[in-house]
């Protein structure tokens, strides 16, 4: 038995040395593991610098005004040229039916800020104390809430939604467009609710618009830059999602023309989302029909194979060989990216060093904790890969014997995915023989364990071994521990029956974290002279989209460019057709069907700018010949920087919106 295992390990070592199967080599250093974090930090720094730089004038003027007497009111400010930078003013006196916000509390007099005073508790620090350095605590708290929202969504909310879809028997396409989209966009949705009912400002709309641009431009740019190879995109997923998104944006622009949102307009936007869900139900059938109509007159060239298959008797004598590394094919929809198997939580990335840039070691696209495995675990992991490839090889050989084909392409469905193909192509020279089939005795029990490993890993509070991980663990422990105590982890088989508690409990925690995030963002903006709308367009939009950014980069590095692009657009469809109209509809129902005031020329221009950026994205992808290369990545970053600069200039009234309503 020892000789047999030694022979198997030697074979595994040779297999790992093969260049075509280098997926299980540990060749990533700590420096490369931190590469993504450094790049994200660089771009977030650029966003913050660009935001602050264009608000210096407003900051200095606000500081001058704050040192005056408390008798200075907003009327003289207007006479002195002090502008109010806001996208949405629900307190517009022209609209008699709009409720007025509560009066400013003591210590928060009108001379201290030009922001809309929402229903926030009184800050323990005064405005002067915050400007002298206390605002750093608010910035840290806001970033802390970004991490908290990511953890509660990825570790509890999305897994509970996965259980719900399994209980209801919903297909992956529909689940991805409904429940999983809600899980990924929950922070934006609750930010919109808080903006309508609590903040009485446009922070929710600004966050959704900014998140939409971030997903389209920044996420696609990161995927193009960090992909391992040039990814060829197919037209159908992009055409499908962009078509729905364009229609939704046009509807939104039309509804904004009269400065109010009626209840039936909100209902129409929700209906548009329902139509998208119905379409996703029949997505596969529609795609086949459309492609058949397009290719019905297309001439297909058929060539005979260059070599005939070996006779079955001769082939049976051959030793089994390992094929080349499986290559992931494109064609995935947004449903595949938003399931819990594909989403690698930020807690796992921070604590367990699950490198988002590392080569996938698991079977068919599942990242594993390879670095933290024991020697036995690593052996079982390699054995499971070899076992599955050997099983596919047996099916390939059988089909070749039956059909006489020289090469065979087998399509395999990824877990929780409906349209992602894996192409298994036998390799003639880049493979090592497995001698005497000795693997069969050592991996009989590995398959059952592999099936368990492929399930989403439950939350672990085990104490890390490295110092850096221990520091990170202590930082996030105040977030993780209350969640671990109050929410059952449905990824454990014994806790799956408690999924309703996890579902509603996660919603409660998301609401709390979103409220704290918006409140502290309001305090930061009030202190340095940046409106809530700019905070939503830049900082909040990027912070709430970081988990989707990491997931999209991981998927793009696996070769699934279509899945990353489609998910970026698909999540925006949910934000526009649910994240915005649902709070509006609830507001109109509560206030006896009174319309919601959106009297804002800046917001209208921001949505039009978003529409223009979407057209630029389509044009850029077409100019790059439907390939995700480095050039496309730099174009996306350039467009995102242009959007940030123009948005800030519009909010500061340095530029005037050319589109008037």
From Swiss-Prot:
GO MF terms held by the record: calcium channel activity; calcium, potassium:sodium antiporter activity; symporter activity
Modified residues (Phosphoserine): 336, 340
Bilayer topology term: Multi-pass membrane protein
Residue ranges of Alpha- repeats: 174-214, 541-572
Known glycosylation sites: 111
Function statement: Calcium, potassium:sodium antiporter that transports 1 Ca(2+) and 1 K(+) in exchange for 4 Na(+). Required for learming and memory by regulating neuronal Ca(2+), which is essential for the development of synaptic plasticity.
Protein name: Sodium/potassium/calcium exchanger 2
Gene assigned in the entry: SLC24A2
